[in-house]
A protein has these predicted regions:
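N-terminal auxiliary segments of SAM/dcSAM-dependent transferases
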Residues: 1-29
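Class I S-adenosyl-L-methionine
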Residues: 5-6, 12-15, 173-209
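A recognition module on extended beta-rich or small alphabeta surfaces enriched in W/G with H and D/E
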Residues: 19, 160-161
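Conserved SAM-binding loop and adjacent beta-strand
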Residues: 35-50
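Short histidine/acidic/glycine/proline-rich micro-motifs that form metal-
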Residues: 37-38, 171-175
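The AdoMet/dcAdoMet-binding core of the Class I SAM-like
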Residues: 48, 52-159, 175, 179, ...
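Conserved beta-strand signature within the Rossmann-like core of class I S-adenosyl-L-methionine
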Residues: 163-170
């Protein structure tokens, strides 16, 4: 029996660098990058609180898009709250997908290993829309600048169904607070409603048209 954390697997990714699969008594099995949990563990609990809040709005979710699928924590919860939904996941790092399948039970998702920006542009061209879009696009603790551009946010809004909801996950500690709040101001100019929700050290920005 392990008393603290046990490293189940370590791999080197050309995108995320060193990725560890960790098992702990407190948080179960999770995927960590640079000491920051990416999938499973506390991340699962953060998204559970967030999606529970969204589920209370009684929105109809037939199609869900997860940008930044990671190891699949969020996709499990989507199935829990909207069992009849069809989920599409986009993840740029195939290593995360592989570990998710091996250790976190990632399944029942249409997986696209590609850049989220390109996927959204492709969805726009084919006129696809989603009822729930989850944007969780960190590489470690870095949020790629291109996903803060107005052009990307406009594209997200266009592929969101009329009564749909999109939630952006931002880290919310130290200097990350200012970054998150600046991003929130951009969203407020593009969406009719932006709700601020704070589970743990994160800011979830829940937006609707």
């Amino acid at each position: 029996m392990f008393l603290t954390n046990k490293i189940l697997k370590t791999i080197d990714s050309p995108i995320n660098g060193k990725i560890e699969v960790v098992k702990s008594l407190a948080f179960g099995t999770y995927i960590s990058i640079g000491g920051l949990t990416q999938s499973g563990g506390i991340v699962y609990e953060i998204w559970k609180k967030t999606l529970k809040r969204i589920a209370r709005k009684n929105i109809l979710v037939n199609k869900c898009l997860i940008l930044g699928l990671g190891g699949g924590s969020v996709s499990k919860l989507v199935k829990q709250y909207w069992p009849d939904s069809y989920t599409t996941g986009v993840e740029i790092d195939k290593s995360m997908v592989k570990l998710g399948k091996e250790y976190l039970g990632l399944k029942d998702v249409e997986i696209n290993v590609m850049d989220a920006y390109k996927f959204c542009m492709r969805s726009l061209k084919s006129k696809k829309q989603y009822d729930l879009i989850i944007v969780d696009l960190y590489i470690g603790d870095k949020y790629p600048e291109k996903f803060e551009y107005v052009e990307f946010i406009r594209t997200i809004k266009k592929i969101l169904s009329k009564k749909g909801i999109v939630v952006f996950n931002r880290l919310y500690y130290d200097r990350k607070r200012k970054e998150a709040l600046n991003f929130a101001k951009i969203l407020e100019k593009k969406f009719e409603d932006v709700e601020y929700f704070h589970p743990e050290a994160n800011l979830m920005l829940i937006c609707s048209k």
